[in-house]
Amino acid sequence: TNYGIGTHLADTVGDPAECQRIIRERAEKWAKEFDANSLYILYRAGIGSDMTPLAGDIKAPLLNVLADTDSVVDVALSQPTVDLLKSKGVDAEFHEIKTRYGHAGPMIDAGLWADRLRTFLDRTP
């Protein structure tokens, strides 16, 4: 899958039928709790929107962590984005992790960047 959950379940659960059951259970729970209008708004905001003029308005420090296998967010755009934010005075940094788990990799393999997060939080006011 694009998000890496199927790969993670295959690695940890093994049984394909059980993996499918878990995915369906999670999807049904998500669908009951999540407002689909939020996806529409996020989609509209991301299509044809140039936020560059507002980049300097960001006040919170940013640690952007992406997986090298992410097929949802293009990891190649991350460093240029962080460089742009820095040029606007934003405290931003990028960290790429190597994981099999795609878009969900930074959550599933959080241990791969835990030290980086700890350092980031320790220096963040």
Question: What function would you assign to each model-found segment?
Answer:
Residues 64-70:
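Conserved strand-to-loop "acid loop" that flanks and positions the catalytic carboxylate
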